[in-house]
A protein has these predicted regions:
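Basic nucleic-acid-binding interfaces
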Residues: 1-141
Length: 141
């Protein structure tokens, strides 16, 4: 039997590691919107794909959190990725959107200290993708 074509490979491994990450804003302030949301999305792709060699399958936001569905190589450490992601996005976004964020945060905050992450199986992939895509729709409906 051949290798499943959905597997990714690198020099030393063949793998299929997919994760669903949710990061929440500090105090759940509703800051993820408009140009801020666009820049956050752009930074998310860049950090995950360029800095950590991950593949982003889906991103969606609500005003106080972001969902990221991504595949990662086995050598990637989840805690390092999340820490780096939160640190880099907070630093850049607080600098670029200082005036916009001023009414929400007096101290240099953006993200809550905690986060949610889970593995995604082949069976749950479609379900989680659909859930992430529908995040914005639930607040409108």
């Amino acid at each position: 039997e051949g290798v499943n074509m959905s597997y990714r490979t690198n020099r030393h491994s063949c793998y299929d590691l997919e994760y669903h990450l949710v990061v929440v804003t500090k105090y759940r302030h509703p800051v993820i919107d408009g140009a801020f949301k666009d820049r956050l999305t752009e930074l998310t792709y860049r950090i995950f794909e360029e800095n950590f060699q991950c593949y982003v399958n889906e991103i969606n936001t609500d005003k106080d959190h972001i969902h990221i569905l991504f595949e990662a190589p086995p050598q990637m450490t989840l805690s390092s990725l999340v820490c780096s992601y939160k640190t880099v996005t907070a630093r850049l976004l607080r600098k670029e959107f200082a005036e916009y964020l001023a009414p929400f945060y007096w101290k240099p905050y953006l993200w809550s200290r905690s986060y949610f992450v889970c593995t995604v199986s082949e069976r749950s992939h479609e379900l989680i993708t659909e859930y992430i895509r529908n995040q914005r729709n639930k607040e409108k409906g």
